[in-house]
Amino acid sequence: MQRNEVVQLTVVPKGLADPFPYILDYARGKRVLNVGASGGVENYLPTKRESWLHHRLGKVAAELVGIDIDSESVAFAAQHGINLLVADCEKCSFTQTFDLIVLSDVIEHVNSPLLAIKNLAKQLSPNGYLLITTPNPNHYGLVLRAWLGRHTEVYYDHVSALLPEHFQAISNRLGLKLCDVMFFSHLDRRSFENRLKSYLARLLGRLAPRCHGSLMVVLQLD
């Protein structure tokens, strides 16, 4: 939706306590393509397999295909019996279609988010879904840093920061339907400071969902 030259969301954003049950419900009994499947795989295999999104998707999906552009991480997964494909989501093509395509913290890495979404939409079955998670540019920590005059920390391979309104604009341009927008915060257990920040993000997110650390959008091939 557009008002004058400003994008208007067609859905009301919501807060989400835990994104994984939501993602797995979408994947249950479906043909699923997991894009960026080997991201962080070295942290999960072999001992923390149950926490790995690709493994969890495999438990509920009727069929699961995983791709990643990082050939080294794909090779690492293969050493542990996991078959993934080396592929670029901006260019890949399949002989089959998928009911659900998942991009979990991937879209901020790609050269062109719009081209990636456009190409992946071609791999969807009729009425299929694209489910995308990405860091939230309005995260309370970033706003606080701006107020305090501190520099913004950006990961070296993150090249875009997308708001829900950007996904609405992309959907409008590509003829997709924006079905849902949700904000959530992962619980970071790596240190006491990180846990404290996570709990604060969750607390503030209850009051204002856009304070959460991450966002999720669901796009449908309409």
Locate predicted features.
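N-terminal presequences and immediately downstream first alpha-helices
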Residues: 9-25, 32-37, 61
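Residue-level marker of regulatory loop/turn positions in helix-turn-helix DNA-binding domains and
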Residues: 24, 95, 208
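Conserved SAM-binding loop
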Residues: 28-143, 162-168, 215-221
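S-adenosyl-L-methionine-dependent methyltransferase catalytic module, highlighting the catalytic core
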Residues: 3-10, 16-18, 45, 90, ...
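Generic anion/oxyanion-binding catalytic loop in active/binding sites
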Residues: 21, 102-105, 156
